[in-house]
């Protein structure tokens, strides 16, 4: 999955380790926690993994924009959930990425057409 990008050699022990492009340790833990809180909020409201059952992906695009615009207008926290608007927007980006990675663009739309052309 991940090709090595470089080789690390420990200066004290000489031990070697391939470094990969994917470096999850670089993701801010607090931001990741907020993303998990949004996932938990959604699971409480809609059911665990409800989003994997499919819905028109334009629903996530619309929600992403609503949360981003709320943040741009100076509102950091969502009134309903009390969680950061940017965490909600990030969750919808992640859902869209998951749909794309699983070739679900057609499966998760209201019709058989790829809705990206209408955005």
Residue ranges of model-derived segments:
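Basic/polar, acidic-poor N-terminal "presequence/leader" segments
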Residues: 1-38
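Conserved small/polar residues in nucleotide/adenosyl-binding loops
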Residues: 108-113
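Low-complexity, charged, repeat-rich alpha-helical/coil interaction segments
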Residues: 1-6, 64-70, 78, 99-100, ...
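Serine residues within intrinsically disordered or low-complexity segments
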Residues: 117-118
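Short, contiguous, well-structured surface segments enriched in hydrophobic/aromatic residues
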Residues: 23-79, 85
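Short, compact, well-ordered microdomains
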Residues: 79-107
């Amino acid at each position: 999955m991940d090709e090595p990008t470089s080789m690390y050699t420990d200066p004290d022990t000489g031990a070697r380790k391939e470094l990969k492009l994917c470096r999850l340790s670089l993701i801010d833990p607090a931001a990741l926690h907020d993303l998990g809180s949004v996932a938990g909020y959604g699971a409480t409201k809609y059911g665990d993994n409800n989003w994997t059952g499919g819905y028109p992906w334009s629903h996530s695009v619309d929600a992403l924009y609503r949360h981003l615009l709320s943040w741009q207008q100076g509102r950091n926290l969502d009134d309903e959930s009390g969680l950061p608007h940017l965490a909600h927007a990030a969750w919808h980006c992640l859902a869209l990425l998951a749909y794309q990675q699983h070739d679900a663009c057609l499966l998760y739309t209201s019709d058989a057409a790829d809705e990206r052309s209408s955005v």
